[in-house]
């Protein structure tokens, strides 16, 4: 069953003698399943290895979470027929379309900002680069800790600079979104401390107020 407003996806997969259901369409592809279809908002089905029976048809109204494409979604997933990675390229392209800033490099705040930055770089003609690398094995997402000082520490410790791509450079960074602003603030301060000449920020999603 999918939630009645369709805020989160639910997709069905199939192969000979088996069926599956998953939040992410990529989850079962390496297991030999192919995508059968997505459930509509509020739709309820009964599955067996050989069939799918609709118990409650989908309703017309949908309020799917747009954050799936800009942030939460895995790059190889599709939601409502739209591939996440392709949507992020398009978002970056649109950000660059009417932008007139001059920079040396375009970069994304890893990981989900990276695809947006590639789209921006492709449209603008400015080269894509990775002025810092994210180190994540021991650090959670920076917005998750309840304490602000811990959020600041996490955001700081995750970023490892590439000095030759920062010092004296004009940089344009794209982040997927602004939730608490912790990662963005720490990123900008980090880049200036590392010798950046200019730092321009473009969020792929409007700030959450």
PLM feature segments, named:
Residues 106, 113-120, 124, 128, ...:
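Extended, hydrophobic alpha-helical segments in both membrane/secreted and soluble proteins
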Residues 153-209:
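PRPP/pyrophosphate-binding module of the type I phosphoribosyltransferase fold
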């Amino acid at each position: 069953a999918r939630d009645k407003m369709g805020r989160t996806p639910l997709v069905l997969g199939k192969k000979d003698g088996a069926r599956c259901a998953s939040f992410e369409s990529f989850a079962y592809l390496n297991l030999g399943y192919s995508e059968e279809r997505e459930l509509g908002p509020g739709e309820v089905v009964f599955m067996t290895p050989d069939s799918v029976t609709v118990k409650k048809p989908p309703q017309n109204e949908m309020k799917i979470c747009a954050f799936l494409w800009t942030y939460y979604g895995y790059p190889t997933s599709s939601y409502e027929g739209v591939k996440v990675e392709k949507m992020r390229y398009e978002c970056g392209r649109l950000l660059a379309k009417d932008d007139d800033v001059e920079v040396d490099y375009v970069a994304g705040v890893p990981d989900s900002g990276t695809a947006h930055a590639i789209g921006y770089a492709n449209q603008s003609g400015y080269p894509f680069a990775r002025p810092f690398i994210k180190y994540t094995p021991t650090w959670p997402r920076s917005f998750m800790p309840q304490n602000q000082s811990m959020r600041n520490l996490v955001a700081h410790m995750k970023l490892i600079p590439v000095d030759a791509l920062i010092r004296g450079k004009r940089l344009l960074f794209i982040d997927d979104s602004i939730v608490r602003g912790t990662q963005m603030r720490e990123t900008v301060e980090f880049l200036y401390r590392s010798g950046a000449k200019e730092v321009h920020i473009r969020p792929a999603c409007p700030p959450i107020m």
